[in-house]
């Protein structure tokens, strides 16, 4: 081992001292201190940013991984269950289509049925008729009972029996004419004497032909030629000739039990329908029945009488009930010859087909009636005043006999045909 070199030791000592001095300046120099601090902060910030970027990258990577997993799951589902989804969709489509087809079918059936009902109409085929009963001349009254009863329509009237009617001069008959009238000579406080006749014979179906020269007319009057079944209204009622006060148009009306309607159906007729429910107790009907008014020709009242009257016809069969009126100058030759053929006539005034009314159920065997009442349920009250008639109906009828000289029936004949 040799002796240490003193020069080398001095250099070593100097370098150590210089280093120590530099370190001291770095530590205690404020400027260098701030610079160093900033460098530290910058380095720390850069580290945080790098860490944040790394976090975002990791998050994006995680999201991508999740999306890829979801996509892979859906793809797997599509690959694993395509038949199930298609099967389910086709079943759903089939069910919806089936429901729609059923609904369309039901709706079409309902509408089709309504249309079929609305358009359906009886053929009213031609019949060969034979005369079964004729009321005329001096034997006319022998076929009727005189109904000495209280008026069921609450009229201001006294219905007399046959003997009383004859004594008071209310009835008469010869080979050409049959007269039935109300008293037109005296005042009455309990009702004006009049007539109500009902046939002794029942009829079921047939052609009823009334040749009428004159019908009762004037304020307060309510005449009617009609048919009536037992157990009213279930047996039915057919008003062939009817009007009140100073009216000018005849009305043909059916009165029935529940279940006979003429609404929304095909009807072939020239008259005007007034009501469509024939049930006497239909809401707000007040026993109006289902009436048809004859708007043309002098079918009622003063004009009818001045025109020499005319012929009223009722055709009653299972398919329906129809009615005609012919002016005196327009009576078909087959009627006057005694061989009526309704199939050859013009359209009826009234048509009541069996579309919504079982004719044979609603109308039992019928009797024929003629009557003449006053005021009552129809001709009186507001109807009387609205016709322009004076005072109250009962007072006028009871105290003005001279106003009832036109209140009479003049009948040429009534014939009943059946097939």
UniProtKB/Swiss-Prot annotation:
Q: Where is the GH16 domain?
A: 122-387
Where found in the cell? Membrane
Keyword Transmembrane recorded:
yes
Quote the EC number: 3.2.1.-
**Lineage in the entry?**
Eukaryota, Fungi, Dikarya, Ascomycota, Taphrinomycotina
Regions crossing the membrane: 88-108
Residues in the active site?
237, 242
What is one GO biological process annotated to this record?
fungal-type cell wall polysaccharide metabolic process
Q: Where is the composition biased (Basic and acidic residues)?
A: 30-59
Which Gene3D superfamilies has this protein been placed in? 2.60.120.200
Query: What's this protein's name?
Result: Probable glycosidase C21B10.07
> What organism is this sequence from?
Schizosaccharomyces pombe (strain 972 / ATCC 24843) (Fission yeast)
- PROSITE patterns for the chain: GH16_2
Q: How does it sit in the membrane?
A: Single-pass membrane protein
CDD domains documented for this protein: GH16_fungal_Lam16A_glucanase
Ligase among keywords: no
Q: Name one GO molecular function term.
A: hydrolase activity, hydrolyzing O-glycosyl compounds
**Family per record:** Belongs to the glycosyl hydrolase 16 family.
Annotated region described as Disordered, given as residue ranges: 1-20, 29-67
Keywords, comma-separated and alphabetical: Glycosidase, Hydrolase, Membrane, Transmembrane, Transmembrane helix
One annotated Gene Ontology cellular component of this protein = fungal-type cell wall
């Amino acid at each position: 081992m040799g002796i240490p070199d003193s020069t080398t030791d001095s250099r070593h000592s100097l370098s150590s001292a210089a280093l120590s001095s530099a370190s001291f300046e770095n530590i205690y120099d404020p400027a260098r201190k701030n610079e160093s601090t900033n460098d530290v902060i910058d380095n720390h910030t850069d580290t945080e940013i790098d860490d944040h970027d790394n976090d975002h990258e990791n998050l994006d990577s995680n999201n991508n991984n999740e999306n890829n997993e979801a996509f892979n799951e859906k793809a797997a589902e599509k690959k694993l269950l395509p038949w199930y989804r298609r099967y389910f969709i086709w079943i759903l489509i089939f069910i919806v289509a089936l429901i729609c087809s059923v609904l369309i079918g039901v709706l079409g059936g309902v509408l089709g049925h309504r249309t079929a009902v609305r358009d359906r109409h009886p053929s009213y085929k031609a019949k060969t008729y034979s005369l079964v009963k004729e009321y005329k001349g001096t034997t006319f009254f022998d076929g009727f009972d005189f109904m000495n009863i209280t008026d069921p329509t609450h009229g201001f009237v006294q219905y007399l029996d046959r003997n009383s009617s004859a004594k008071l001069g209310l009835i008469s008959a010869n080979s050409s004419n049959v007269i039935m009238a109300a008293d037109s000579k005296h005042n009455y406080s309990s009702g004006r004497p009049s007539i109500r006749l009902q046939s002794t014979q029942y009829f079921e179906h047939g052609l009823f032909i009334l040749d009428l020269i004159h019908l009762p007319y004037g304020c307060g009057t309510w005449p009617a030629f009609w048919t009536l079944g037992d157990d009213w209204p279930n047996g039915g009622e057919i008003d062939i000739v009817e009007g009140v006060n100073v009216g000018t148009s005849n009305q043909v009306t059916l009165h029935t039990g529940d279940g006979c309607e003429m609404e929304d159906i095909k009807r072939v007729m020239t008259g005007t329908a007034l009501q469509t429910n024939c049930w006497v107790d239909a809401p707000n009907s007040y026993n109006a029945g289902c009436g048809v008014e004859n708007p043309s020709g002098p079918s009622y009242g003063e004009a009818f009488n001045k025109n020499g009257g005319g012929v009223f016809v009722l055709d009653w069969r299972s398919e329906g009930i129809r009615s005609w009126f012919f002016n005196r100058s327009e009576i078909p030759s087959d009627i006057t010859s005694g061989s009526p053929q309704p199939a050859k006539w013009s359209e009826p005034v009234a048509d009541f087909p069996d579309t919504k009314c079982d004719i044979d159920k609603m109308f039992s065997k019928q009797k024929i009636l003629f009557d003449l009442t006053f005021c009552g349920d129809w001709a009186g009250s507001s109807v009387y005043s609205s016709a322009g008639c004076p005072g109250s109906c009962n007072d006028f009828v009871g105290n003005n006999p001279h106003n009832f000289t036109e209140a009479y029936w003049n009948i040429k004949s009534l014939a009943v045909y059946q097939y």
